[in-house]
Amino acid sequence: MRILADENIPVVDAFFADQGSIRRLPGRAIDRAALAEVDVLLVRSVTEVSRAALAGSPVRFVGTCTIGTDHLDLDYFAEAGIAWSSAPGCNARGVVDYVLGCLLAMAEVRGADLAERTYGVVGAGQVGGRLVEVLRGLGWKVLVCDPPRQAREPDGEFVSLERLLAEADVISLHTPLNRDGEHPTRHLLDEPRLAALRPGTWLVNASRGAVVDNQALRRLLEGGADLEVALDVWEGEPQADPELAARCLIATPHIAGYSLEGKLRGTAQIYQAYCAWRGIAERVSLQDVLPETWLAGLQLNPGCDPVWALATLCRAVYDPRSDDAAFRRSLTGDSATRRAAFDALRKHYPPRREITGLRVATGGRVELQRVVRALGAQLV
């Protein structure tokens, strides 16, 4: 097999070395010419895999190490008989960790009690569903809007987007980017909906940039709107709007899901799909390539404050403010310089682990055990 992989996909050799020759390119450089002699294509969300790129090529399998598939022309895949796989849920936990870090930062700036907020989660799939589980596990009030899932689960606890926007203090977006169809999500938060947000609302977008009208949001913030905003995704990536970023509390270069576990899990999942397509046995597993957790164990004093414990456990693993600082330093120079810096921050992103790898002792205190279990860490 002739395999072409995005150069930023990790451990490709570990999984695919015995399957043929492997060539690597920057994801944005993968085009029609690059696919002339390729059987298997492995990509991330930065590569548009379209009819124009694939027509006449020998590509027969496409794997994307991402949850979303809006960069894949699935209609053409079906027409051309091209097998494909995404990696659903691969980085979901990393995104949840990111959102928790943003909430902690917002609470610190606002002097707010996280337990007193009402959370609105828009999109309850792989990422949003896990976030809902964590927030409810902590005992917090959560409203969920997911029309496609509501249609499948009519007895589920769902609310309309209008009700969620009217009642939630915190809004976290986790929808795919659908430009048409029954439930389009492009500019789901458009200018009228953004303008109608309650004063003091916190908004987090770690889904796709165009789910929020970036220009409308910038105008709103420039006008002094009382909002706290965390954006990991941007319209026109890798060109992020520096004026919008300057008005966000947290601004990062599409790295919410960039945990080490998430990256390796994504490669493992497309390898599993590839083996199923080929009808061959899997020779490598995620556990073969995943290093030991970096924190062997944490001991909480049974008398500590549960809110402090929550913040400490989350920040022991990840604090998005470090990524925010690095991103802001990159938002200088001309547009070409900023685009290159955006991609460089993603390419050279430092390893980060997930909260689920923590092993935590609580001395038997029930309130602390609840925090540990809600976060998905291991209780010892």
From Swiss-Prot:
Pathway(s) where this gene product acts: Cofactor biosynthesis; pyridoxine 5'-phosphate biosynthesis; pyridoxine 5'-phosphate from D-erythrose 4-phosphate: step 2/5
One cellular-component annotation, GO: cytosol
HAMAP family tied to this protein: PdxB
Protein name: Erythronate-4-phosphate dehydrogenase
Pfam families according to UniProt: 2-Hacid_dh, 2-Hacid_dh_C, DUF3410
GO molecular function annotation: 4-phosphoerythronate dehydrogenase activity; NAD binding; protein dimerization activity
The entry's keywords: Cytoplasm, NAD, Oxidoreductase, Pyridoxine biosynthesis
GO biological process: 'de novo' pyridoxal 5'-phosphate biosynthetic process; pyridoxine biosynthetic process
